[in-house]
Structure formats: C-alpha cells, structure tokens
C-alpha cells in the first residue's frame, strides 16, 4: 500500500513550506491585483500591456482578477478589456463586471472567465456634497470556476477614499470605512472578504484604518493586513518596499496608499488561502520577500522619495518600470497584488467491484483516493493539499488515516478487507466506504463496494452455499452430462473420470 498516512502536525509543516513563495511567479493559484489607473478613459495600450504581461527575470504581473480605480466611463472599461485580451502573452479570456457610473471616478472589475465566475455587484453609495465618502464603494462578489461552496467565494470592496491628511479628510474616510465594515458584517460568515484599492491613508493609526482592522464585538467584517506592516507609512524609508505612490510625480515614492486587506480566514490554513506566511511582517531589507506573494508591482525599494527607478530596477527591469511610470501619468499609483491558493478537490473510485467472492471468505480490495484539483487551470502550487480520512460500513476493514495528498501526482492506494460473502443464498452484496475530506464542496464522498457471493470452492455448485450436499452433486452431474465447462474441475479441457475424482475429493473435504 502506498497510502501516505500522516499526523496532523506534518500537514501544518507542509503548508508552511509551501507558503514560501520566492519570486512571486504568476500562473499558480488566483492572483488578485488592484490598480488606481489614473483617470482612465482609454489609450495607453502598449504601456498597460507591458505593465501587465511584460516579463522580467521570469516575473510577470499576469493577474487573474484586476480591480481598477479612476476609470472614467464604460468605454474606458471596455478599452481595458480589449487591451488585456490583445496583449502578447494574454490568455485572451478577460471579461468585465457591470460598469456603474457614480459621482466622480469609478471602479471596474476585470477578471479571467476561465478562472472566475462573476456573481454580482453591490454599491455602497457616496455621500452628497463634502460630508463623507466622495465616491461609491463597489462590492464585487466572485466565485471560482469548479467550486460552489460559500467558503470559496470572495466579496471584494473596491475603494478610492478621500485624499488628504487633515482632520476633515480623515473623518470622511472613517465614514466610508464604517460603511464597508457594516456591510461586511451582514455577509454570510463563510464568504471571504477583501478591501482593496486606493485608501489614501497615511498611517495605520488613523481612524479609518483602525475601523477596518480593529477588534469589535462583531468581527465578521474585520480585515487584516496579510503582510502585517502597520506604521506611519508616509515619508518613512522603513516602508520603502511597500510604497505605491507616486511612481511618476514630483513627490516620489513615499506613501502606501494602495493596499489589499483580507479576511482572517484566508490565513487559517484551510480552504481558500493566502500564499505566504499570513501575518508575518514584510521584509525591510528586500522587495523579494520569500514569505509573501504580496507585491507592490515595480517597487524594488530603490525609489524612495523619487520617481520609480527604471534602469537597474531589480524587480521588473526597465521596460516594465517605464510602462508603469507612463500609466501613472504624473500623479498615479503602482499596482498591488497577492496570490491565493484554491482548496484541494477530493476524488476517489466511485465503485470497487470485488467480482465473485467465495462464500465465507475474507477478500482484499483496493481503493484509489486523493487530490483531484485541476492543475491545468490552477497549477500544482496553486492548489492546497487535500486531507481526508476513511470510514467504512460493517464488514469492511480499512485504515482510517488521516491522509494527505497534493494535486498533480498519482492518487493514494488504500487496501481494505471485505468480510461480506455471508449469504448462503448467493447473489450480490454491497457496502460503503466514506471519504471524509476538507474539500469544501464534497466533504463526504461515498465509494460503493460490491460483489457476488459464490460457492466456497468449485465443487460448491448449488445453494445453499457453504455446505456440500446432495444438491451440489446433482448440479455437478447435470453439468457433466451436458458437457458444460463448470464440470471440468481439473481444468484440462476434457470432461472425464478425473473430473469425477476431483469432485469426489472436494466433496469429501467440504467447505473450509
């Protein structure tokens, strides 16, 4: 048996090792990006394509979901879809959620239809005048292709909060933050939440940030910074690797205005998961933090208080860096992204047919089970291990586990014993083995074990099975007289005296 029976602490260690993501390669799992794209109404085609699909040192942004702010119109959003689908290296499967024209600039949801299912959009409206939120907040609800459970869904709040550091600006951001948290608290607790975009917040001590991330009586709407990097970000070189603004303007790179805050459930070690060591502070000495998939795309830390470094940019190289500066258009932002690992998918034999089983015997069977996650879609590193145990009906004996399996390899093989051939009348038998897993869609997968009861050996030819009697002798003589293969007990292809001797010997010995 090649089944990989494990203890649970091994699973935790495996998840920790898998979380180390050196280099933030695109392709595996689900990559979600946010980008304030600077008053966009079309154009900048080459720069956007290079920024998104350009490659440097095997790295590319290549998101699966792109949530944009400062989109000016439906035509602007449609232009983005066209630009992404026509970009060299694009899979060409980009679609957009509905565009809603609110006050000021707006958000847009772009997503790859091969990976993402659009579920709906909800608006948290802006406030009139200058009293609160200057722009609508969009909540985009999405699911994953191939998954149905609520725990695989995401509700993403796209924000573009009030700019400025004055007390009035901060008060208006607080109003917006409260509105987001109040809405998130009403969602089903199983749904994952995320807030992303241009927060325009200078410090984690400001009231809006505390409202979003702080402990409250109802924590269903609480958000967390996956890279655990609080502080006073503005004009502070300690945060030079996570700054996002401004790559092109006179102020230079000195603010962490653009962020992605997430549900704590995305770091609990089960189901849909952040790829990285959730809650571990981001490195302060390198952009290439192996503990995180979270990146401020294009910021290699060499641009503090100046425009984005192009020549010698160690994260994205000159071509992508120039494209990012051009898209920012003199007062813009860098994209931010992170990667999520999708849950494992349990798969197993649906039926194990033991065939003909001699009455009263105990026979062995084999069951294949393991991780059937779609590696063609999500990549082997983008799918969580599946963990499972086995539970069997009476008459079946199997090691319950627990077990773990990674996607993309061969399934585990489990041997079991079946003591089911107990019907002297013959006929079929059946029993079930249940595969109990952490697959959110199929927590219980039932495997049917079937077979047919036959005589205890070849001379036990008639019911009741398990006893050699007058009826077995009649059955043998009848088969012999008709020249049937069933009477060829010695298997030499000829019905003769030696078959009669063989029957007599077996008859005398009886059933085991």
Range-by-range predicted roles:
Residues 342-456:
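Feature for long, exposed domains in two main contexts
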């Amino acid at each position: 048996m090649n089944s990989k029976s494990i203890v649970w602490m091994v699973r935790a260690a495996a998840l920790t090792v898998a979380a180390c993501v050196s280099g933030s390669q695109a392709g595996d799992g689900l990559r979600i990006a946010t980008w304030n794209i600077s008053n966009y109404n079309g154009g900048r085609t080459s720069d956007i394509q290079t920024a998104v699909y350009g490659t440097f040192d095997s790295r590319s942004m290549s998101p699966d979901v792109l949530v944009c702010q400062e989109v000016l119109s439906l035509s602007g959003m449609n232009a983005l879809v066209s630009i992404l689908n026509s970009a060299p290296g694009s899979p060409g499967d980009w679609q957009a959620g509905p565009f809603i024209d609110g006050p000021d600039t707006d958000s847009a949801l772009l997503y790859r239809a091969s990976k993402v299912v659009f579920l709906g959009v909800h608006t948290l409206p802006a406030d009139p005048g200058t009293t609160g939120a200057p722009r609508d907040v969009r909540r985009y609800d999405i699911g994953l292709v191939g998954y149905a459970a609520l725990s695989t869904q995401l509700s993403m709040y796209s924000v573009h909060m009030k700019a400025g550091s004055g007390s009035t600006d901060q008060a208006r951001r607080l109003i917006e933050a409260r509105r987001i948290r109040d809405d998130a608290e009403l969602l089903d607790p199983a749904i994952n939440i995320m807030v992303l975009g241009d927060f325009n917040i200078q410090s984690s001590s400001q009231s809006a940030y505390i409202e979003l991330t702080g402990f409250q009586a109802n924590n269903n709407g609480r958000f967390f910074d996956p890279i655990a990097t609080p502080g006073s970000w503005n004009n502070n070189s300690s945060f030079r690797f996570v700054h996002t603004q401004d790559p092109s303007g006179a102020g230079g790179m000195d603010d962490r205005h653009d962020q992605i805050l997430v549900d704590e459930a995305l770091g609990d070690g089960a189901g849909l998961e952040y790829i990285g060591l959730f809650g571990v502070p981001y490195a302060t000495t390198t952009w290439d933090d192996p503990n995180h998939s979270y990146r401020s795309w294009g910021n290699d830390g060499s641009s503090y208080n100046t425009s984005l470094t192009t020549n010698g940019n160690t994260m994205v190289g000159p071509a992508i860096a120039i494209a990012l500066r051009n898209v920012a258009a003199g007062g813009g932002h860098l994209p931010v992204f992170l990667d999520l690992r999708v849950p494992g998918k349990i798969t197993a034999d649906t039926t194990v047919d033991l065939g003909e089983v001699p009455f009263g015997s105990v026979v062995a069977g084999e069951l294949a089970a393991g991780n059937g996650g779609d590696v063609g879609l999500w990549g082997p590193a983008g799918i969580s291990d599946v963990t499972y145990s086995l539970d069997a009906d009476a008459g079946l004996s199997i090691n319950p586990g627990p077990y773990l399996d990674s996607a993309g390899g061969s399934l585990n093989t489990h041997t079991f014993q079946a003591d089911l051939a107990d019907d002297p009348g013959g006929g079929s038998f059946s029993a079930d083995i249940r595969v109990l897993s952490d697959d959110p869609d199929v927590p219980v997968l039932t495997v049917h074990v079937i077979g047919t009861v036959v005589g205890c050996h070849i001379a036990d030819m008639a019911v009741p099975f398990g006893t050699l009697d007058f009826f077995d002798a009649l059955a043998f003589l009848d088969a012999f007289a008709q020249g049937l293969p069933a009477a060829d007990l010695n298997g030499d292809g000829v019905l003769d005296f030696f078959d009669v001797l063989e029957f007599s010997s077996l008859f005398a010995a009886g059933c085991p």
